[in-house]
Regions:
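Well-ordered secondary-structure scaffolds
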Residues: 1-235
Length: 235
């Protein structure tokens, strides 16, 4: 259950109540049910968008990928294995990613369903870069702002009949807690329709904050990053 600016539940008390209700309903139905409360105040991983996130997921299956995505993937796998009565240790789960077994199983799943695991993912023909306006520490990269920007680039729909661009989205080159320099690339915007860039940049206004190194805001951003993406476990 996600909580934060980019989630349906903005406050942790709301998310906790929803998670507790879902766990209780599942348990009452005789199904082993657990929930994780996860931080969505800033985007998970380094991408937002359809093909971009698939590519990032494949990096994780191949033993790489962003640490926060790996941590959440492993945590969910441990919970699901335990709920199924086949518990595993964390180091076993991480080893399955690191040694390629997870990727091998994914490739086999795709092949058995008639797909091609070697099929290339599409790339956006148009990109633009968003740069840091000043030196300092990136203290805010708001998940809602990034999500709206990705949507305006074509990654989502305003109406159910609207087409979705598989290639559209945002790549993040820095996360809250990182030191940045003026002019450094913070984001890459991806789309098939370059006229979308202006409104995507407008969506990001106010969603990116750079604070002075050594400030309380910078220290808080580093502390939040070190805390990790998993806030609570319920059930």
């Amino acid at each position: 259950v996600k909580v934060g600016s980019g989630a349906f539940m903005k406050e942790i008390d709301q998310a906790r109540e929803l998670a507790s209700t879902m766990v209780a309903l599942g348990t009452d139905a005789g199904v082993t049910t657990r929930a994780l409360l996860t931080d969505m105040s800033t985007p998970l991983g380094r991408t937002a968008g359809n093909a971009l996130e698939v590519a990032e997921s494949l990096e994780v299956l191949a033993g790489g990928g962003p640490a926060d995505v790996v941590d959440l993937t492993v945590a969910l796998a441990l919970e699901m294995c335990a709920a199924a009565g086949r518990p595993v240790e964390e180091d076993q789960a991480r080893a399955a990613l690191a040694d390629g077994r997870a990727m091998d199983i994914w490739r086999d799943m795709i092949s058995r369903q008639g797909g091609d695991p070697n099929a290339p993912l599409p790339l956006a023909p148009e990109t633009e870069t968003v740069t840091a306006p000043a030196d300092g520490v990136l203290t805010t990269l708001d998940a809602l702002a990034v999500g709206v920007a990705a949507w305006r680039l074509g990654a989502g729909r305003a109406r159910k009949e609207d087409p979705v661009q598989a290639v559209a989205g945002v790549t993040m080159h820095a996360k809250p807690g990182d030191e940045v320099r003026a002019g450094q690339s913070l984001l890459t915007l991806h789309t098939a329709t370059p006229e979308r860039f202006t409104r995507a940049r407008e969506a990001l206004a106010g969603g990116i904050v750079i604070s002075e190194a050594g400030s309380p805001e910078a220290a808080d951003a580093v502390a939040r990053r070190e805390r990790g993406v998993i806030l609570e476990r319920i059930g």
